[in-house]
Amino acid sequence: MAVSEAGYESIMINCNPETVSTDYDTSDRLYFEPLTFEDVMSVIDIEKPKGVIVQFGGQTPLKLAQALKNAGAPIIGTQPESIDQAEDRELFKSMVQELDLLQPYNEVATNLEEAIVNAKRVEYPLVVRPSYVLGGRAMEIVYNDDELKTYMTEAVKVSNQSPVLLDHFLNKAIEVDIDAVSDGKNILIGGLMEHIEQAGVHSGDSSCSIPAFSLSNELQREIIRQMKEFTKKLGVIGLVNAQFAVRKDKIFVLEVNPRASRTVPFVSKATGLQLAKIAAKVMIGISLKEQGYLDQIIPDFYSVKGPVFPFNKFPDTDPILGPEMKSTGEVMGTGKTFGEAYIKSQYAAGIHIPDKGKVFISVREPDKNEKLIELGRFLSNEKFEIIATTGTANFLNENHIECQQINKVREGSPHIVELIKSKDIELIINTTEGKQSIEESFSIRAEAVISGITYYTSLEAAYATLSSFDFLGDISVNRLQDYNTENG
């Protein structure tokens, strides 16, 4: 629509069959074709466009950009050479070092022996993945050599042409997403999103908030500064997304994507900025200054994006979250406070937060911390009855939080799954790590799904509910347009 407003005809190529019913009036002409080099070039040969935009189709069009340009297609916006610099592992690492910024230590491996050697250098835990993935497919977090061997031999096919990437996993880090638009001179920060789940959960599966709810203003300013450095260095024209991780006040860049990300619609709704439209105009030569968009808009209200999962339809799928994306949709909650926005997003996703009853808690060792103590005290004060497995129960009791101990399944009856089946549990908080522990606790999460019991597989998500209890049963409904009248 942006290019149509500027006096150009717009042509869309979409491989989704649903495009015939959803996008038929969005462009002047719509092609329902596979996104392959041959099919796209056939359309280009017929239409002879003045410009080809590859930023709005996710990862697939980016991979075609260089071949299309080599074949004579007039790519507008960020050029293929810049796309390669962001996508290529070694080129990106060199750029990070040149800018004197931080990145999780990483190596590549083309066989099992090389992976074991490089893992020692990178240090466990590791995020392991094939070199080219969509939606985090075949990505895992491994904690030792045995798990790495299993991954290398069973999960992926490795070769010189298809190496496996080994990244040091930043445990207990806060992940941050930024969407921005650049015209090559000025950069508009669309929105900085703080994730609720820790780094290591796929960004599509993590809830996130605009504005940030816990990061200091100083950290946010530094993240934005680094974002602008990457954007300038890459020569971005149009949209760009970057993901960062913050641990102990140190900022690590995870990746930079010179394209529209899945968060653009959320950011646009939360801020009132039509980022896709602004970026399209930038790519056809209308600067940010000419459009009147130079300053970041920080809303005076909170918006929380929440994922929607299909686990009730697939009870054999483990609902524990990790690097591989499992959500199939998303919702948005808006409120004057983070707590109000968060509980609205939970309700919209079909998650009921109980206000009393029995809560089962079993957490991994790194989660036995101040957040768990605060959460336990809060639940106890709210008249919840806490039940926990031995290690978690000992930790809570040592910190003067009353709880009842119950067996894990492998410890024999009476155990937690029996209690869940009896419909005597209202809330489950179950975090775990390591292949064996995840497999042993699967029955807890599976039974929670079958029984329709609210559960959290990350301490951070459970902790976020603390600020929401004031709004239980007291949800106000407001039009999004009323929040964004100033941003039009």
Model-derived features: where do they sit?
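ATP-dependent carboxylate activation and anion-phosphoryl transfer catalytic cores
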Residues: M1-G51, Q59-L62, P74-G77, D84, ...
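ATP-binding N-terminal substructure of ATP-dependent carboxylate-amine bond-forming enzymes
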Residues: M1-L101, T110-V117, K336-T485
